[in-house]
């Protein structure tokens, strides 16, 4: 239902945000960007 799709959307946003944060962190650490 609505709550399931909302939860899935939140998980998707959290995953992409986490991935972006990890990439930024890795970039700062080993200067690969």
From Swiss-Prot:
Signal peptide: none annotated. InterPro entries: Antimicrobial_frog_2. Disulfide bonds join 27-33. Keywords: Amphibian defense peptide, Antibiotic, Antimicrobial, Disulfide bond, Secreted. It is found in: Secreted. Expressed by the skin glands. Its main location: secreted. It comes from the Eukaryota. One of its GO terms (cellular component) is extracellular region. GO terms for biological process: defense response to bacterium. Coiled coil: none annotated. Belongs to the frog skin active peptide (FSAP) family. Brevinin subfamily. Has antibacterial activity against the Gram-positive bacterium S.aureus ATCC 25923 and the Gram-negative bacterium E.coli ATCC 25726. This is Brevinin-2PTd. It comes from Pulchrana picturata.
